[in-house]
Amino acid sequence: MGESDLSFTKLFEFRNEDDAIFHNVVELVKDKLSKNLKLNVNEALLVYCAHIVSEIRSNNTESEIANNSSKILTRDNVLIGVPESLREITFNITLDNFPKKIIKYTEPIPTVNYIMVDSKTNGS
């Protein structure tokens, strides 16, 4: 019997004056994705964080934001092990003048058989 999964906490915290830095880092990660390079855990978390910030500023609800999580990244966008590390992600967000929101993603990157599937032979 293996050990149970251990959760970890990653804190993204920035003030308004850090907004430009946040957006520059997000653009660097998006550039990496556009070159078909795979993201590590920290980069994947940043993508989800940026998505949430954008969705909150568009006045979307917590459930609308959470329901779109499976469309953000796929197993082909991330390194092996990232989907397992991010089986459940909870963001506690206080942004601008919006009330605090709690966004929870459950298995945002599907893990079912992703190591066993060869995208070249599957046509993906």
Give, region by region, the residue ranges found by the protein language model.
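Non-transmembrane, aqueous-exposed alpha-helical and coiled segments at domain scale
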Residues: 1-123
